[in-house]
Regions:
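Polytopic transmembrane helical bundles with strong interfacial aromatic enrichment
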Residues: 1-143
């Protein structure tokens, strides 16, 4: 990559890879976003199976989306720090496909949430599975 963008990306990669505090901060933000977003989503997914019916706070979705925003930004920063490794990694692309599936499932889940029933349970089960598979893929990327 050449030009100003290439120079900026190379500068970021140098800073990220050579500065432990920067690397740690970005990695922490990524893990914290997954923990908060995934934890809240898993809690809501579990509530969908309650015999009393789902009691899901509508503000929960904003928290999950905010956490996903943190994951997106920190993930982009990690990607830009090592483009060659990530862009050629099958695990990375599988993880990205899982993230797209999670977002699509979340869209459907929000639409069926008020009705409850079998579709809420299905999207909740899929959500829990996708969050855990994304975590597994992310773990495979860093090990």
């Amino acid at each position: 990559m050449s030009g100003a963008l290439g120079t900026a990306i190379a500068g970021w990669a140098h800073l990220y890879n050579d500065n432990h505090a920067v690397n740690t901060t970005v990695t922490f933000a990524h893990f914290a976003g997954v923990l908060v977003g995934g934890g809240l989503a898993l809690s809501a997914d579990r509530a969908a199976f309650s015999p009393l019916g789902p009691a899901i706070d509508p503000r929960l979705h904003r928290w999950v989306l905010g956490a996903l925003g943190v994951v997106f930004v920190s993930g982009m920063l990690m990607l830009l720090a090592d483009l060659q490794t990530y862009l050629t990694s099958a695990v990375f692309w599988i993880k990205m496909a899982l993230v797209v599936a999670l977002l699509a499932n979340g869209y459907v889940r929000v639409r069926v949430e008020a009705r409850g029933g079998v579709w809420l349970r299905r999207t909740s089960a899929l959500s829990a599975s996708l969050w855990l598979l994304i975590l597994l893929a992310g773990t495979m990327l860093v090990s």
